[in-house]
Amino acid sequence: MSKTVVRKNESLEDALRRFKRTVSKSGTIQEVRKREFYEKPSVKRKKKSEAARKRKW
């Protein structure tokens, strides 16, 4: 879980920008989007195989 403490003399916008940066670096948003809907194991395998094929070529 990302945590950001507002520093002394720091605007809320700057703190929010730092928070968004830490969340994006940790991959939290991508993980939530990936887990939003259930994905059958066969579909997971198919996507993994397609991603590997795409990386190769």
From Swiss-Prot:
PROSITE patterns according to UniProt: RIBOSOMAL_S21 (PS01181)
Organism encoding this protein: Lysinibacillus sphaericus (strain C3-41)
Record carries keyword Ribonucleoprotein: yes
Transmembrane segments: none
Keyword annotations: Ribonucleoprotein, Ribosomal protein
Ribonucleoprotein among keywords: yes
Coiled coil, from the record: none
Lineage: Bacteria, Bacillati, Bacillota, Bacilli, Bacillales
Protein name: Small ribosomal subunit protein bS21
Signal sequence interval, chain numbering: none
Gene: rpsU
Family: Belongs to the bacterial ribosomal protein bS21 family.
InterPro entries for this protein: Ribosomal_bS21, Ribosomal_bS21_CS, Ribosomal_bS21_sf
GO MF assignments: structural constituent of ribosome
GO cellular component: ribonucleoprotein complex; ribosome
GO BP field: translation
